[in-house]
């Protein structure tokens, strides 16, 4: 009887650990709101872009079923903050760290880092913004 109870407790502990491991793994699914953008130059320097109160509302939502929506904010010709919503689908290749969103247009980004509450992506393609012959990368930070 003691062996049976010990076996049951050990099995329960193993199952509990597996569940905890799955829950702690970061997921790309969720509502992501932009927090900042940093342009990292090929020469090692960087420039942080300050978002105005309108741009700081930009966000997108990725759902478990592969559907997505994004809301982009910008200033119109009259100085008003206006929004534009796009709906579509997405795919995420975890191994190659590629997120592709299919809405009004196709957007592909490289996932640099993902945690429970932060997503950092690199805009694709990269450009030589300062014309020094070195590739510069735009890092975009999002929070849940």
Residue spans of the language-model regions?
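Sec-dependent signal peptide hydrophobic core
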Residues: 5-9
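C-terminal motif of bacterial Sec signal peptides marking the signal peptidase cleavage site
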Residues: 14-16
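Lipid interaction determinants
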Residues: 18-89, 93-144
